[in-house]
C-alpha cells in the first residue's frame, strides 16, 4: 500500500510540489505518492488530524495555512517555526506527535549559497513583509546577515524588523518604506523580492529597474512564474547576478523530504522536474 504525502492550501491547483516530490519518490524506488489537497484555514486542524489518522507520511502547507498551523493545539512547532510564526512542513511521529517546521528560510539560504553568496556579513535588502519575507529574514539574520526590510507599508517593515531583533539573532535588522530603495541598493550585496510584483499575470511589474541596480549585486526573486521575471531581466541588464525562485522552491521541498523520510532526495532531478512543469 502506497504511503501518502501531500500539500494543503487554497488555492492549490497550481502547485508544482506533487510533480517534484513524485519524481523524487519514483527515482528512489519508494512506494509513495504525493497529492495536492484544497483545505480552508477553518478546516486545517481536522485535515491534519485526519491525515495523521490515515497514516500519511507528511505534509506541506502553503498559502493561506502557514500562520494558522502555528496556532493549532495538535502541532508542536520547532523553535525556528515558532519564531517565524509559520509552519510549512508537518512531520508525523511514531508516537502520535505532530511536529511543525518551516523550511522556507533554509530554502532561500541554500539558493543564495548555490549562487556563491557569503551570507555572514552581507548587506541584504528584503522587499516585502509577509510570511515568506519573515521566514527568509529570520534565517538570514540567524546566519549573520545585515538585513533591511523594505515594504510599501513602512510600519509593517519596522514591526517585522523588531520581531527579528527581539529574537536575539546575530544579524542587524532594520525596517523602512520602499521610497529610497534605489539609494539603499547602491550599498547592498543582495536584493530579495518576496512580493508578488512580477508574478503571473502581472508580469510587467517590478520592484526595481536596471538603473537602480549594479554589477556587484545579487538579485534573488522568489517568484518563479514566469521563470524569468521582469526584475531578473532588469538585473541581467544591469550586470547583476541573478537567482531564480525555482531554487528556493526546490531546496525548501528537499529539506521537507529529509524531515519526512531521513533520506537524501535527488535535488537535481527535483529541479529539472519543476523547470519542465513551468
Regions of interest found by a model, annotated:
Residues 2-117:
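Phosphate/diphosphate ligand-binding glycine-rich loop within oxidoreductases
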Residues 9, 102-105, 112, 117, ...:
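Glycine-rich adenosine-cofactor-binding loop
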Residues 35, 148, 243:
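Conserved beta-strand positions in the Rossmann-like core of class I SAM-dependent methyltransferases
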Residues 57, 62-68, 131, 196-199, ...:
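Short glycine-rich anion-binding loops that position phosphate/pyrophosphate groups of nucleotides
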Residues 142-146, 238-241:
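Conserved S-adenosyl-L-methionine
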Residues 143-167:
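NAD(P)-binding Rossmann-fold cofactor-contacting core
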Residues 169-242:
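Rossmann-like adenosine-cofactor binding region
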Residues 218, 222-278:
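Adenosine-phosphate binding glycine-rich loop
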